[in-house]
């Protein structure tokens, strides 16, 4: 009887440890992405590819895209926060 109880405790602790370990591995925090209007773009933004290239090359952003913000389309750059 004592061996059975000990075996149950060992099995339970092993499963608990595995669940806690897998829970920590499965959780990966997502980095936040910050958006701000391009400081180097002039005029209306029509082509997102051009905006993306300018944000990446000139402003060291991860990416860029055209979005509407009153009163026109603007180039927005995306950075890791």
From Swiss-Prot:
PROSITE patterns: GAMMA_THIONIN. SUPFAM superfamilies: Scorpion toxin-like. Gene3D superfamilies: Knottin, scorpion toxin-like. Disulfide bonds join 34-81, 45-66, 51-75, 55-77. Keywords: Antimicrobial, Disulfide bond, Fungicide, Signal. It holds the Pfam family Gamma-thionin. Residues 1-31 form the signal peptide. One of its GO terms (biological process) is killing of cells of another organism. It comes from the Eukaryota. PANTHER family: DEFENSIN-LIKE PROTEIN 1, DEFENSIN-LIKE PROTEIN 19. Belongs to the DEFL family. Antimicrobial peptide probably active against fungi like B.sorokiniana, F.oxysporum, F.graminearum, F.avenaceum, B.cinerea, P.beta, P.infestans and P.debaryanum. This is Antimicrobial peptide D1. It comes from Stellaria media.
């Amino acid at each position: 009887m004592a061996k059975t109880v000990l075996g149950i405790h060992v099995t339970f602790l092993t499963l608990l440890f595995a669940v806690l370990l897998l829970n920590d591995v499965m959780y990966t925090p997502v980095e936040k992405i910050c958006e701000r209007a391009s400081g180097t773009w002039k005029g209306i933004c029509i082509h997102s590819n051009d905006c993306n290239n300018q944000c990446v090359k000139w402003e060291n952003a991860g990416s860029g895209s055209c979005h509407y913000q009153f009163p026109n389309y603007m180039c927005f750059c995306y950075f890791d926060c």
